Structures are given as structure tokens and as C-alpha cells.
Amino acid sequence: MAPVTPPVKPAPVFDTIYFDGNKTHINPIGAKSLDRNGLILKENPHLKVVIEGHTDSMGSDVVNQKISEKRAQNVKKYLQDKFNISDDRMMVKGYGRTRPIADNNTKEGRAKNRRVEFRIVP
């Protein structure tokens, strides 16, 4: 008889955190999403993530790069402060406006591009 393999637990799905234009602070809607992400990290202590910051295309490359990095850093700090997630489990990376997921020619598209995403790493 063949051995029974236990079911594989699917990888958790993290919420995307959205930001207001040209802002780096976490708004109340973003905080609710971050709280869900914090619980995922708390319940899965083996997980490590890269916190990836992004911007829309408004403004200069230099400014957008700084904004994307600051957004990612603020998300990391929030998770450290509120959920006591250790520093070695979270890396931050800013991509500026180089990785849009929507059309930057529309207000709606720009709003989708102002975000922080979580990527699980080994």
C-alpha cells in the first residue's frame, strides 16, 4: 500500500496596501489590510517576505524611488511595531514607477499603481 502524503498547505495570500498620491503614510484602509497581513505573518512564523513599494508615474524618477522605498519601510515598521514581526523576516525594496500594474494615464490606474505588495521568499 502506498504511503499517504499529507495535503500541502497553500501559500497565504497577502493584501495589497494602497496609498494616496505622493504620500507615504498608511491610511485607515491600508491599516486594515496591513492588520490582515500581520496576522498571516504571526500565524506563519516560518514565512519571510519582501515588501515591495511602488508609485504611479507622476513626478520624477528620483522622487518616486524615494517614495516607494519609504512606503515599504513604513509598512515594515507598522508590522514590527504592532505585530512584533522580526526584522530578519522582512526585506524592503522600492521600485518607483518602474512596475505599473495599471494604466498611468487614468486616475484609477494611477491609484492602483500606488501600492505596496508582499512577495514570499524562501
Language-model features: where?
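Periplasmic peptidoglycan-binding/tethering modules of Gram-negative envelope proteins
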Residues: M1-K48, D81, I85-D88, P122
